[in-house]
């Protein structure tokens, strides 16, 4: 079964040249600021399953998202595209490259969350289930501003709340996501590494101030062994929210992988 994703388009009309894949709990419009730095590039920015305005029905797996993204590219692409994945989106991007190498011209992996320690995942999920929502928007904003979004400009954080924070039936506030789906996706992040095919041009951006770190030495060694000269590692001085904290630099990386057309 192929599921249609809600897709935000940026840039001129026409076949997508870039596919962006967001992280767990996020949405396609999170790429809005980055897209402003690539105004002439047609970009497809979907909400993943269980996120935003895409369907919330199960299954909630990497494989289900890969199938939906492949169908999206079959409909909105015209040949291989540069696939940009942040965090969980980086894991999905690697699986997409392995499953449909004909659709992937290059990978840009922004602090990808791949093969995380299972105990760490359990702690994150326990905390998420213990405190799944917020008293008011101010509490939601404070959590992000003192966490992974600490080095993101305040107006960008404000736009995130305007788009993604919603009032819940219980009178509290939460993100526009399916909580059961998030539990499943965090579990998916503990899966073994799935590498892109040999010859896949790949840039991995490591957020050096992400704590705890998402990018492991195991992942870097595996990519380097598989891809050799086709693998590039860049270190950015920022926290985990790389596309929001460093949009100019990320846009330059994407341009370097696009090439002429």
UniProtKB/Swiss-Prot annotation:
User: Which Pfam families did the record assign?
Assistant: Abhydrolase_6
Activity control mechanisms: Is inhibited by tetrahydrolipstatin, a specific lipase inhibitor and RHC 80267, a diacylglycerol lipase inhibitor, but not by phenylglyoxal and iodoacetate.
Instruction: Recount the entry's temperature dependence annotation.
Output: Optimum temperature is 50 degrees Celsius.
A Gene Ontology biological process term: fatty acid catabolic process
Gene3D superfamilies recorded for this chain? alpha/beta hydrolase
Q: Which reaction does it catalyse?
A: a carboxylic ester + H2O = an alcohol + a carboxylate + H(+); a tetradecanoate ester + H2O = an aliphatic alcohol + tetradecanoate + H(+); decanoate ester + H2O = decanoate + an aliphatic alcohol + H(+); an octanoate ester + H2O = an aliphatic alcohol + octanoate + H(+)
**What keywords are annotated for this sequence in UniProt?**
Hydrolase, Lipid degradation, Lipid metabolism, Serine esterase
User: Would you say which domain of life the source belongs to?
Assistant: Bacteria
Keyword 4Fe-4S in annotation: no
Please report what switches on or represses expression of this protein: Expression is early up-regulated during acidic stress as compared to normal whereas no expression is observed under nutrient and oxidative stress conditions.
Residues of the active site are 87, 217, 240
Please state what class of enzyme this protein is: hydrolase
In the Enzyme Commission scheme, what number(s) does this protein have? 3.1.1.1
> How does changing the pH alter activity?
Optimum pH is 8.0. Retains nearly 60% enzyme activity at pH 6.0. The relative stability of purified enzyme is high at acidic pH and neutral pH (4.0-7.0) as compared to its relative stability at higher pH (9.0-10.0).
Provide a Gene Ontology MF annotation, just one: fatty acid binding
Function summary: Lipase that displays broad substrate specificity and preferentially hydrolyzes p-nitrophenyl myristate in vitro. Also shows significant activity with pNP-butyrate (68%), pNP-octanoate (82%), pNP-decanoate (90%), and pNP-laurate (74%). Is probably involved in lipid catabolism. Is active at low pH, and might play some important role in mycobacterial biology in macrophages where the bacteria encounters acidic stress.
Indicate the family of this protein.
Answer: Belongs to the AB hydrolase superfamily.
The record's PANTHER family line, in alphabetical order, gives: HYDROLASE, PUTATIVE (AFU_ORTHOLOGUE AFUA_2G14860)-RELATED (PTHR43798:SF33), MONOACYLGLYCEROL LIPASE (PTHR43798)
Protein's recorded name? Lipase LipV
Q: Which organism is it from?
A: Mycobacterium tuberculosis (strain ATCC 25618 / H37Rv)
